[in-house]
């Protein structure tokens, strides 16, 4: 027969006679003989005589032709109906689908019936009406089958518990039938076994086409179960394959009454839970959370963090640099105010260098910051990176010049006294110079902003600023600011405002001073190196005894009259030098350079700096100690009164 040609047909058997099914015909898997019989007899009921055996004839391959009445009855019970023929020559899947769709007639289960009725459709009509030979019996039978089909459809939809009534009806229908009827319909295995073990599938199995294996419907159905499962999974295209789908979905056990229904339902159950759960769960959980988290993650990590990191880097870097620049500005202001070196000496060189070294002495970590401070200070100063080398050279040259040339007399001891009673400040950290350093540290940022202005304005009013600073040696930056405008332009005032900042932000101020004066920047780098060497010397300088301070004062007394401002700067520088030997040398040189710069122009100072770069390096070691002593001497001279008080 045809089913031999069709591999799926081999898996499926005729629901009526048990032969291999040729395909899904009239809503059930049937062989060609039963298909043609039903087609002929359905329209010619008059030709069919009543059963002589009270309708108890067994329809099988051998005796299927013995009783037309029983054969037609079984065809109807299997679910065959003339309505199934109106689909014409269509695929088995399509026929099953359409049949189940009609039987269910429920919009809710329509789509479910389409997919599920493909498998359950064949049996849905035949399941309940098996007892009646009337063609209407098929429809009448649908009373239970539609629920069964609907249940199957729902099971496919993944709502096995959605319609318990349907399952109950299917189970009730299956269980209500006698064992014999179930055997006749093949529902005993499909309904009872399937419905009890797999209620979702059980209901479809009621109408399953396989239900009518009169001889051994259960056995056949159980054997067919696997094919049904395979067919159902593969969505059979062949006549029998669609029948398998029909049995798989419709009753899952219509064809595979015992084993098959259970398996299809399991598959259905698996599909049903997975489909609804994964889609809502996956869609909602993975889909929703990712959108929810992704925007924040992007905003936070890429958006905020990069921005924050970049901002923080920019802010943090500028902050130390700005603080250092402010410290440098304060140092410049103090230097200018104390010694008027800004006017005499290049505004960016000696004053800044002194404060840079001073701050370096106080804050040795500044050398690490120095590169960034150089960059920021370069921005502050037009010289930029190129000025670094020039600044170093100029700074060192200024230091050498200041050392070689005695600082020009400048009566500005009070400014230095407030800024640096270098030795006393070092010896007595609570001294005004220490306070000023703290203030300078506090006002590093202000000093940076003011450092540039201080450099410019300090050159003009360094002497006045020095006087003002001398008036208020250890005062808060605000006082220094007030003094600065009084003595100088408000630009130098930031430098004055940050005497504390200088002490607090020694490294930052030195770096900022580097930035404030590009020429000083290279010097600051050199001084940073010197600072490392001077760190040891700083301790020695700090260890200077009051006697040394007094002796320095005595020696510095004449110098005080000569150049209180320069000596105060030298004292500050000496404090810085005490912190750093080389820095102290460079600071003393810077103080001398401040004096020399006041005498010499900026160009001359730069030239002398270039000349004395090597000398500074050579004399750095020797001058480190001398400058330590000299710096205290200068400090004492510049701040003799304050030094005495502080000693």
UniProtKB/Swiss-Prot annotation:
One of its GO terms (molecular function) is nuclear receptor activity. The keyword Zinc-finger applies. Transmembrane segments: none annotated. Residues 370-381, 420-432, 567-579 have a biased composition (Polar residues). One of its GO terms (cellular component) is nucleus. Residues 11-87 bind DNA. Its main location: nucleus. Keywords: Developmental protein, DNA-binding, Metal-binding, Nucleus, Receptor, Transcription, Transcription regulation, Zinc, Zinc-finger. GO terms for biological process: epithelial cell migration, open tracheal system; negative regulation of DNA-templated transcription; regulation of mitotic nuclear division; regulation of transcription by RNA polymerase II. It is found in: Nucleus. It holds the Pfam family zf-C4. Residues 200-223, 232-247, 502-519, 580-599 have a biased composition (Low complexity). Residues 120-134, 248-260 have a biased composition (Gly residues). A zinc finger (NR C4-type) spans 14-34, 51-75. PANTHER family: KNIRPS-RELATED PROTEIN-RELATED. This is Knirps-related protein. It comes from Drosophila melanogaster (Fruit fly).
């Amino acid at each position: 027969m045809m089913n031999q040609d069709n591999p799926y047909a081999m898996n499926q058997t005729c629901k009526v006679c048990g032969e291999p099914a040729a395909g899904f015909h009239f809503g059930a898997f049937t062989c060609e003989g039963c298909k043609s019989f039903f087609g002929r007899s359905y329209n010619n009921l008059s030709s069919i005589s009543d059963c002589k055996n009270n309708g108890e004839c067994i329809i099988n391959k051998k005796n299927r032709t013995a009783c037309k009445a029983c054969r037609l009855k079984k065809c109807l019970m299997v679910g065959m109906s003339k309505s199934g023929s109106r689909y014409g020559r269509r695929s088995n899947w399509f026929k099953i689908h359409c049949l189940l769709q009609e039987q269910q007639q429920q919009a809710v289960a329509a789509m479910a019936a389409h997919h599920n009725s493909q498998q359950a459709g064949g049996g849905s009509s035949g399941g309940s009406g098996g007892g009646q030979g009337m063609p209407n019996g098929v429809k009448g039978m649908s009373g239970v089958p539609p629920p069964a089909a609907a249940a199957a459809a729902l099971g496919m939809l993944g709502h096995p518990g959605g319609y318990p009534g349907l399952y109950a009806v299917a189970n009730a229908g299956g269980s209500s039938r006698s064992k014999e009827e179930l055997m006749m319909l093949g529902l005993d295995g499909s309904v009872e076994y399937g419905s009890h073990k797999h209620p979702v599938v059980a209901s479809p199995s009621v109408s399953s086409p396989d239900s009518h294996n009169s001889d051994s419907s259960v056995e056949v159905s159980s054997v067919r179960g696997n094919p049904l499962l395979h067919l159902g999974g593969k969505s059979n295209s062949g006549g029998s394959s669609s029948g398998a789908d029909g049995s798989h979905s419709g009753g899952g056990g219509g064809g595979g009454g015992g084993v098959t229904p259970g398996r299809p339902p399991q598959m259905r159950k698996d599909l049903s839970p997975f489909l609804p759960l994964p889609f809502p769960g996956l869609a909602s959980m993975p889909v929703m959370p990712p959108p929810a988290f992704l925007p924040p993650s992007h905003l936070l990590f890429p958006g905020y963090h990069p921005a924050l990191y970049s901002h923080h880097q920019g802010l943090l870097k500028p902050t130390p640099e700005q603080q250092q620049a402010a410290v440098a500005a304060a140092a410049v202001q103090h230097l200018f105010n104390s010694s008027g070196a800004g006017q005499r000496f290049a505004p960016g060189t000696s004053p800044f260098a002194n404060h840079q070294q001073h701050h370096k002495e106080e804050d040795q970590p500044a050398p690490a910051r120095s590169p960034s401070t150089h960059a920021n200070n370069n921005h502050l100063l037009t010289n930029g990176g190129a000025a670094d080398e020039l600044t170093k050279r100029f700074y060192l040259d200024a230091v050498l010049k200041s050392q070689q040339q005695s600082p020009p007399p400048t009566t500005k001891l009070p400014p230095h006294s407030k800024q640096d009673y270098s030795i006393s400040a070092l010896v007595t950290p609570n001294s005004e110079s220490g306070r000023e350093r703290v203030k300078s540290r506090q006002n590093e940022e202000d000093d940076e902003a003011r450092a540039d202005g201080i450099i410019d304005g300090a050159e003009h009013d360094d002497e006045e600023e020095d006087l003002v600073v001398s008036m208020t040696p250890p005062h808060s930056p605000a006082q220094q600011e007030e003094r600065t405008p009084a003595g100088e332009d408000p630009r130098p005032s930031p430098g004055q405002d940050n005497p504390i900042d200088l002490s607090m932000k020694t490294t930052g101020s030195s770096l900022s001073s580097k930035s404030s004066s590009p020429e000083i920047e290279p010097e600051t780098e050199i001084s940073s190196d010197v600072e490392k060497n001077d760190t040891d010397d700083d301790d020695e300088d700090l260890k200077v005894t009051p006697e040394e301070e007094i002796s320095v004062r005595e020696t510095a007394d004449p110098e005080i009259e000569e150049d209180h401002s320069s000596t105060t700067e030298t004292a500050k520088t000496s404090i810085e030098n005490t912190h750093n030997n080389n820095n102290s040398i460079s600071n003393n040189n810077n103080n001398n350079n401040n004096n020399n710069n006041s005498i010499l122009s900026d160009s001359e100072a730069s030239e002398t700096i270039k000349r004395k770069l090597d000398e500074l390096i050579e004399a750095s070691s020797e001058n480190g100690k001398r400058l330590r002593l000299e710096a205290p001497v200068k400090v004492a001279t510049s701040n003799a009164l304050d030094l005495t008080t502080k000693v």
